[in-house]
Amino acid sequence: EGENVRVCAIKGNFDDAQTGVKKIFTTPSVAEKLAENNMLFSSANSINWGRLLPQIVYYISAYCDLVNDGKIELGDKINVVVPTGNFGNILASYYASLMGLPINKFVCASNSNNVLTDFIKTGVYDKNRNFYTTISPSMGILVSSNLERLLYKLSGDNDEVTRGWMNALKSEGKYEVSDDV
Protein backbone atom coordinates (compact mmCIF):
# COMPACT_ATOMS: atom_id res chain seq x y z
CA GLU A 1 0.00 0.00 0.00
CA GLY A 2 1.46 3.32 -1.05
CA GLU A 3 4.63 1.75 -2.42
CA ASN A 4 4.58 4.07 -5.44
CA VAL A 5 4.39 7.25 -3.35
CA ARG A 6 7.42 9.19 -2.18
CA VAL A 7 7.78 12.31 -0.07
CA CYS A 8 10.69 14.69 -0.34
CA ALA A 9 11.65 17.92 1.36
CA ILE A 10 12.82 21.06 -0.37
CA LYS A 11 14.65 24.15 0.79
CA GLY A 12 12.35 27.00 -0.09
CA ASN A 13 8.76 28.15 -0.02
CA PHE A 14 5.59 27.08 -1.83
CA ASP A 15 6.53 28.98 -4.98
CA ASP A 16 9.86 27.14 -5.12
CA ALA A 17 8.11 23.78 -4.73
CA GLN A 18 5.44 24.58 -7.30
CA THR A 19 8.05 25.79 -9.81
CA GLY A 20 9.84 22.47 -9.41
CA VAL A 21 6.64 20.49 -9.85
CA LYS A 22 5.71 22.44 -12.98
CA LYS A 23 9.19 21.82 -14.37
CA ILE A 24 8.76 18.08 -13.82
CA PHE A 25 5.40 18.20 -15.63
CA THR A 26 6.96 19.91 -18.66
CA THR A 27 10.23 17.99 -18.94
CA PRO A 28 9.94 15.57 -21.89
CA SER A 29 12.59 13.16 -20.56
CA VAL A 30 10.64 12.76 -17.32
CA ALA A 31 7.42 12.09 -19.24
CA GLU A 32 9.22 9.50 -21.38
CA LYS A 33 10.71 7.74 -18.36
CA LEU A 34 7.32 7.62 -16.63
CA ALA A 35 5.66 6.28 -19.80
CA GLU A 36 8.31 3.55 -20.09
CA ASN A 37 7.29 2.41 -16.61
CA ASN A 38 3.55 2.78 -17.28
CA MET A 39 3.34 5.59 -14.72
CA LEU A 40 1.81 9.05 -14.58
CA PHE A 41 2.87 12.10 -12.63
CA SER A 42 0.11 14.02 -10.88
CA SER A 43 -0.32 16.85 -8.42
CA ALA A 44 -2.92 17.04 -5.68
CA ASN A 45 -2.89 20.81 -5.38
CA SER A 46 -5.03 23.26 -7.29
CA ILE A 47 -2.84 23.34 -10.41
CA ASN A 48 -4.76 20.12 -11.12
CA TRP A 49 -8.32 20.61 -12.38
CA GLY A 50 -9.30 17.52 -10.40
CA ARG A 51 -8.83 19.56 -7.24
CA LEU A 52 -11.03 22.44 -8.41
CA LEU A 53 -14.05 20.35 -9.45
CA PRO A 54 -15.11 19.23 -5.95
CA GLN A 55 -14.53 22.76 -4.67
CA ILE A 56 -17.06 24.03 -7.22
CA VAL A 57 -19.51 21.46 -5.90
CA TYR A 58 -19.08 22.47 -2.28
CA TYR A 59 -19.91 26.10 -3.08
CA ILE A 60 -23.14 24.93 -4.67
CA SER A 61 -23.79 22.58 -1.76
CA ALA A 62 -23.13 25.33 0.80
CA TYR A 63 -25.55 27.62 -1.04
CA CYS A 64 -28.22 24.89 -1.02
CA ASP A 65 -27.63 24.41 2.71
CA LEU A 66 -28.20 28.14 3.29
CA VAL A 67 -31.46 27.96 1.34
CA ASN A 68 -32.62 24.77 3.09
CA ASP A 69 -31.80 26.23 6.51
CA GLY A 70 -33.84 29.34 5.72
CA LYS A 71 -30.81 31.65 5.96
CA ILE A 72 -31.37 32.95 2.42
CA GLU A 73 -34.01 32.68 -0.28
CA LEU A 74 -33.31 30.79 -3.49
CA GLY A 75 -31.80 33.31 -5.90
CA ASP A 76 -30.35 35.58 -3.20
CA LYS A 77 -26.77 36.56 -3.91
CA ILE A 78 -24.06 35.68 -1.43
CA ASN A 79 -20.58 37.02 -0.76
CA VAL A 80 -17.67 34.59 -0.84
CA VAL A 81 -14.64 35.30 1.36
CA VAL A 82 -11.63 33.01 0.98
CA PRO A 83 -8.12 33.15 2.46
CA THR A 84 -6.23 33.03 -0.81
CA GLY A 85 -2.73 32.08 -1.85
CA ASN A 86 -2.75 30.02 -5.04
CA PHE A 87 -6.22 31.33 -5.97
CA GLY A 88 -7.71 27.86 -6.53
CA ASN A 89 -10.48 27.83 -3.96
CA ILE A 90 -11.85 31.26 -4.80
CA LEU A 91 -11.52 30.43 -8.51
CA ALA A 92 -13.79 27.44 -7.86
CA SER A 93 -16.41 29.85 -6.49
CA TYR A 94 -16.03 31.96 -9.64
CA TYR A 95 -16.60 28.88 -11.81
CA ALA A 96 -19.66 28.05 -9.70
CA SER A 97 -20.96 31.55 -10.45
CA LEU A 98 -20.44 30.94 -14.17
CA MET A 99 -22.64 27.87 -13.72
CA GLY A 100 -25.39 30.00 -12.21
CA LEU A 101 -24.60 30.22 -8.49
CA PRO A 102 -25.71 33.72 -7.47
CA ILE A 103 -22.62 35.40 -6.06
CA ASN A 104 -22.51 39.11 -5.31
CA LYS A 105 -18.88 39.60 -4.34
CA PHE A 106 -15.64 37.61 -4.18
CA VAL A 107 -13.26 38.65 -1.40
CA CYS A 108 -9.65 37.43 -1.40
CA ALA A 109 -8.33 37.52 2.14
CA SER A 110 -4.55 37.80 2.31
CA ASN A 111 -1.60 37.77 4.64
CA SER A 112 1.51 39.94 4.36
CA ASN A 113 2.36 38.19 1.06
CA ASN A 114 -0.43 40.25 -0.48
CA VAL A 115 0.45 39.99 -4.16
CA LEU A 116 -3.18 39.20 -5.05
CA THR A 117 -4.58 42.07 -2.99
CA ASP A 118 -2.22 44.48 -4.69
CA PHE A 119 -3.10 43.06 -8.11
CA ILE A 120 -6.84 43.41 -7.52
CA LYS A 121 -6.37 47.01 -6.36
CA THR A 122 -3.94 48.13 -9.08
CA GLY A 123 -4.10 45.73 -12.03
CA VAL A 124 -0.34 45.18 -11.64
CA TYR A 125 0.86 41.71 -10.68
CA ASP A 126 4.40 42.01 -9.32
CA LYS A 127 6.15 39.08 -7.69
CA ASN A 128 9.35 41.12 -7.28
CA ARG A 129 8.88 41.69 -3.57
CA ASN A 130 9.90 40.35 -0.23
CA PHE A 131 8.52 36.97 0.79
CA TYR A 132 7.25 36.73 4.37
CA THR A 133 7.08 33.52 6.36
CA THR A 134 3.80 33.56 8.28
CA ILE A 135 1.58 31.21 10.29
CA SER A 136 -0.50 30.70 7.13
CA PRO A 137 1.92 28.96 4.75
CA SER A 138 -0.77 28.03 2.22
CA MET A 139 -1.22 31.75 1.66
CA GLY A 140 2.53 32.34 1.44
CA ILE A 141 2.63 32.48 -2.33
CA LEU A 142 3.97 35.10 -4.71
CA VAL A 143 2.99 33.30 -7.95
CA SER A 144 -0.71 32.41 -7.80
CA SER A 145 -1.07 29.80 -10.52
CA ASN A 146 -4.84 29.81 -10.73
CA LEU A 147 -5.04 33.53 -11.41
CA GLU A 148 -4.01 32.66 -14.98
CA ARG A 149 -7.29 30.75 -15.36
CA LEU A 150 -9.33 33.74 -14.19
CA LEU A 151 -7.43 36.09 -16.49
CA TYR A 152 -8.13 33.76 -19.39
CA LYS A 153 -11.88 34.01 -18.72
CA LEU A 154 -11.79 37.77 -18.11
CA SER A 155 -9.85 38.32 -21.35
CA GLY A 156 -12.67 36.69 -23.30
CA ASP A 157 -10.89 33.32 -23.45
CA ASN A 158 -7.97 34.98 -25.24
CA ASP A 159 -5.05 32.61 -24.91
CA GLU A 160 -2.60 34.95 -26.68
CA VAL A 161 -3.22 37.80 -24.25
CA THR A 162 -3.10 35.46 -21.26
CA ARG A 163 0.11 33.86 -22.49
CA GLY A 164 1.63 37.33 -22.88
CA TRP A 165 0.92 38.15 -19.25
CA MET A 166 2.34 34.82 -18.07
CA ASN A 167 5.45 35.24 -20.24
CA ALA A 168 5.97 38.73 -18.78
CA LEU A 169 5.61 37.28 -15.28
CA LYS A 170 8.20 34.64 -16.09
CA SER A 171 10.69 37.00 -17.74
CA GLU A 172 10.18 40.26 -15.83
CA GLY A 173 8.41 39.12 -12.68
CA LYS A 174 5.37 41.28 -13.36
CA TYR A 175 2.62 42.25 -15.76
CA GLU A 176 -0.21 44.75 -15.94
CA VAL A 177 -3.75 44.16 -17.18
CA SER A 178 -5.88 46.77 -18.88
CA ASP A 179 -8.83 48.42 -17.13
CA ASP A 180 -11.35 46.40 -19.15
CA VAL A 181 -10.07 43.16 -17.59
Regions inferred by a protein language model and the residue ranges of each:
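Domain-scale recognition of functional cores that engage charged ligands
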Residues: T19-G20, E32, E36-S97, L101
